[in-house]
């Protein structure tokens, strides 16, 4: 798949911009704070209805406006798909083929993206919430039912936590009903994640082995607050975990176990990767991103769109060549950079856009 056209209206520092893209390589060139990353963020937001930079949607709206509008035309094997997002102070409206979508799971997945940015190194050493978000964003694109199950789980979780905080006297029967619903959707979420991690590890192990000159083996482990060793009895294990955590939950007035507390760990040759070098972290994250591309292709039969936010200057020649090798394989790619000096051995079929003061102009092919 590839993004043929993008229209931005009052998004970040863009008042109104319309731009047609190259199906292969697109380079956003410009000084810092001109809007290069904002352009990538717009593409990411159009795909996922979420920003990778802020949790507050109103930050995306131009400072002197009250709403924003994004639209794009995605080309896929099955044909053209128009996508639209309108964001106001009241919320967002999403459209596919000009038809309003009632659920997030009905919208996400029509345009798949893989983002690689400097902050992705936090995937290794950052908080568990960063890794959970990583799973949610990637898995949600290739498996819409996951977003539906996750939304339902979070809804029940919020109900349970609200009840724990507000109830003067706990009704054990009502709490048990909430627990049953939490277990139902929680097990679905965990099963989706376990399957995803298994596949990601398979693709990632191969990529990392190649990238490390065949001396490092990558493995990924899903760390759960619930006993997940026996998937057949996962529901029973979750119930037992909730029962054991009941006293703790009543005291702290929140839910201490479940997929909202889970994490993933990365290992290199059996050792915790968080203790590795900066170079190992870069290689590991690059391996994961390249694995994401292959995983998405294997499930959707479409190549995702690759977004590279100022990462080429962070990579040595070996890693750059590996990334460029992937770019050359018919994957539409967007790169931000302050200088073309950082970009070596680029494919010939590319478009360069100069970004200045929230405006984009084509200056090379």
Swiss-Prot record:
One of the protein's GO biological processes: SOS response
InterPro entries reported in the protein's UniProt record: DNA-binding_RecF (IPR001238), DNA-binding_RecF_CS (IPR018078), P-loop_NTPase (IPR027417), RecF/RecN/SMC_N (IPR003395), RecF_2 (IPR042174)
SUPFAM superfamilies: P-loop containing nucleoside triphosphate hydrolases
Primary localization class, coarse: cytoplasm
GO molecular function annotations of the record: ATP binding; single-stranded DNA binding
Record's keyword terms, sorted: ATP-binding, Cytoplasm, DNA damage, DNA repair, DNA replication, DNA-binding, Nucleotide-binding, SOS response
CDD domains per UniProt: ABC_RecF (cd03242)
Record has DNA-binding as a keyword: yes
Residues that hold ATP according to the record: 30-37
Superkingdom of origin: Bacteria
Knockout-associated phenotype: Mutant is sensitive to the alkylating agent methyl methanesulfonate and the DNA cross-linking agent mitomycin C.
GO cellular component labels: cytoplasm
Compartment annotation: Cytoplasm
NCBIfam families: recf
Summary of the function given for this chain in its UniProt record: The RecF protein is involved in DNA metabolism; it is required for DNA replication and normal SOS inducibility. RecF binds preferentially to single-stranded, linear DNA. It also seems to bind ATP. Plays no role in chromosomal or plasmid transformation but is required for resolution of chromosome dimers occurring as intermediates in the formation of merodiploids by transformation.
UniProt xrefs under PANTHER family: DNA REPLICATION AND REPAIR PROTEIN RECF
Record-stated family: Belongs to the RecF family.
Protein name: DNA replication and repair protein RecF
